[in-house]
């Protein structure tokens, strides 16, 4: 008669252990329900596969490196999962080298490393989608290597208080995209830069639309958009406000300042609004070094902003 209660107790203990394993930490892999104490453990559990990591609200002083697979990193509640001040391999809070990564609702802040390139995300390879995320008060928001076969899309996100230009060193930027196949920036805000450019990219195809660039509280900043090697695509329906504290105030958008290895023929810059903050120096809206035909139409430019120049 006593065996039945003992068996029931054993089953209860097993169920309790299984529940503890599923809820073992703030990083939960969907599907399996397994919880992990660190983000790296959750990433390693997905490995070369495909999966989603749900991240509980909290401030995490940790980082992770994804070397394979396709992973979605999603805050359970947008804006409540914060990665603060820790970089893997002296690079970033997330170092991504897998097939694909999706970042949803995360916050990256206070990332700094010895070479002054500390980023929320260092993308070394693979496709990347970032949405509803915040990058703030770090040396860089997103920094990438080159991967011409892959694409990057950033939407409904904010980049604030980023960038640095150390003496005798290379600048860091709000985002610095290498030679990726394409870059799309949609409904995103850039503000309060602390050096460098807001958007710097070597991608041959770009889309920057329905976004805002508020440089009124920027410090030692450069261009709003730097298409370093030239690019085709669209820059449209954005709002630009250039501030007074600039390292380089000569242009808002510069096409091909470093090289002309990408075609810029047909690049469309249209339906944007650009103004100067009080006390800001006169500037040029678009400066081109590609020598190709660029379509610059229907932009609303405030006083002391020249439409176009070639240099």
Question: Model segments located where?
Answer:
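Extracellular beta-strand/beta-solenoid scaffold signature
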Residues: 85-94, 114-122, 137-146, 166-177, ...
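Acidic Gly/Asp/Thr-rich repetitive segments characteristic of extracellular carbohydrate-active
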Residues: 24-62
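Bacterial N-terminal signal peptides that target proteins for export
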Residues: 1-7
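Right-handed parallel beta-helix
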Residues: 56-57, 74-81, 100-110, 127-137, ...
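Bacterial N-terminal signal peptides
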Residues: 7-14
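Leucine-rich solenoid repeat scaffolds
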Residues: 281-311
């Amino acid at each position: 008669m006593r065996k039945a209660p003992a068996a029931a107790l054993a089953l209860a203990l097993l169920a309790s252990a299984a529940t503890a394993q599923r809820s073992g930490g703030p990083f939960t892999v969907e599907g399996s329900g397994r919880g992990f104490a660190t983000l790296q453990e959750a990433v390693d559990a997905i490995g070369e596969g495909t999966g989603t990591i749900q991240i509980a609200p909290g401030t995490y002083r940790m980082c992770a490196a994804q070397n394979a697979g396709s992973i979605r990193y999603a805050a359970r509640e947008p804006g409540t999962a914060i990665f603060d001040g820790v970089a893997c391999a002296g690079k970033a809070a997330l170092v991504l080298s897998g097939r694909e990564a999706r970042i949803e609702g995360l916050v990256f802040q206070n990332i700094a490393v010895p070479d002054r390139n500390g980023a929320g995300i260092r993308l070394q390879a693979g496709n990347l989608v970032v949405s509803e995320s915040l990058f703030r008060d770090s040396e860089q928001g997103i920094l990438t290597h080159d991967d011409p076969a892959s694409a990057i899309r950033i939407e409904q996100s904010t980049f604030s208080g980023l960038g640095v230009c150390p003496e005798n060193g290379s600048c860091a930027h709000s985002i610095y995209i290498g030679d990726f196949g394409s870059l799309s920036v949609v409904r995103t805000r850039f503000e309060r830069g602390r050096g460098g450019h807001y958007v710097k990219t070597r991608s041959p195809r770009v889309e920057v639309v329905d976004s805002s660039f508020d440089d009124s509280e920027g410090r030692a900043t450069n261009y709003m958009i730097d298409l370093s090697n030239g690019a085709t695509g669209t820059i449209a329906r954005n709002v630009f406000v250039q501030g007074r504290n600039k390292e380089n105030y000569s242009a808002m958008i510069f096409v091909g300042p470093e090289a002309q290895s990408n075609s810029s023929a047909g690049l469309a810059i249209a339906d944007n609004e650009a103004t100067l903050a009080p006390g800001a120096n006169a500037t040029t809206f678009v400066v081109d070094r590609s020598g190709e035909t660029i379509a610059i139409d229907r932009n609303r430019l405030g006083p002391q902003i020249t439409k176009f120049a070639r240099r």
